[in-house]
Amino acid sequence: MIGRIAGILLEKNPPHLLVDCNGVGYEIDVPMSTFYNLPQTGERVVLLTQQIVREDAHLLYGFLTPQERTTFRELLKITGIGARMALAVLSGMSVQELAQAVTMQDAARLTRLPGIGKKTAERLLLELKGKLGADLGALAGAASPSDHAADILNALVALGYSEKEGLAAIKNVPAGTGVSDGIKLALKALSKA
C-alpha cells in the first residue's frame, strides 16, 4: 500500500493532482481542504495517501494531515459512503467541524453538504459517534490546546512519532504558541515521557 508520496507538484486541477516522484507521475485526488493549502506547482509537496484498489482502477487519495486521512478512512467504513462522498464531506467541512457536528449530533449541518441527505446524515452521525475519537475532537473548536495543533502534529509525525504520541504531547502546548515553539515544547514533553 502507498501511504505517503513526496515529490514535485506538477499539476493541480481541483480535486486532482499530478505529483512527480523520481520520474513517476502519481495522479492523486484530494479534498478541497488539502487543495487550498498546497504549494505552487513546481514546488515540493508531501502527502499522506490512501490507496484504493478496485477491479478497474488503482486510486490514490491524498491528505496534508493525519487527521484528514484518519477521518477519510472512518468515512469509508460507513455503508453507502464511497471515496467520492468521503472527499465531498472533507471538502465541505474541516475534520474539526465534522467532529463537532458528530459530537453535537447536528444532522442539519451535514445535510448542507452536496450529496448528503437526511438519512445519510443520520447514518453518518450514528456510525461516526465515538469513532472519530477524543483525539480528533480535542482538535475541534475551543478544546484545541494550540492554534497550530495540526501543524505541530504533522511535524511530530514527520519526525517519526506516532499520531497518538503527538496528540498527547500537544496537550502540553499552550494556546497561542507558534509552530516552532510548539514543536519544541511538544518534543520536550515527549522526551520526558
Curated annotation (Swiss-Prot):
Sequence segments annotated as region (Domain III): 144-193
Q: Which family does it belong to?
A: Belongs to the RuvA family.
Q: Which Gene3D superfamilies match?
A: 5' to 3' exonuclease, C-terminal subdomain (1.10.150.20), DNA helicase RuvA subunit, C-terminal domain (1.10.8.10), Nucleic acid-binding proteins (2.40.50.140)
Compartments, as annotated in UniProt: Cytoplasm
Residue ranges, annotated region (Domain II): 65-139
Superkingdom of the source?
Bacteria
Instruction: Give the domain note.
Output: Has three domains with a flexible linker between the domains II and III and assumes an 'L' shape. Domain III is highly mobile and contacts RuvB.
Task: Give the residue ranges for region: Domain I.
Answer: 1-64
List GO BP terms, alphabetically.
DNA recombination; DNA repair
Q: Which UniProt keywords apply?
A: Cytoplasm, DNA damage, DNA recombination, DNA repair, DNA-binding
Q: What is this protein called?
A: Holliday junction branch migration complex subunit RuvA
Q: Which species is this UniProt entry from?
A: Burkholderia vietnamiensis (strain G4 / LMG 22486)
- Cross-referenced Pfam families, in alphabetical order? HHH_5, RuvA_C, RuvA_N
Region described as Flexible linker: 139-143
Q: Provide a GO CC annotation, any one.
A: cytoplasm
Quaternary assembly: Homotetramer. Forms an RuvA(8)-RuvB(12)-Holliday junction (HJ) complex. HJ DNA is sandwiched between 2 RuvA tetramers; dsDNA enters through RuvA and exits via RuvB. An RuvB hexamer assembles on each DNA strand where it exits the tetramer. Each RuvB hexamer is contacted by two RuvA subunits (via domain III) on 2 adjacent RuvB subunits; this complex drives branch migration. In the full resolvosome a probable DNA-RuvA(4)-RuvB(12)-RuvC(2) complex forms which resolves the HJ.
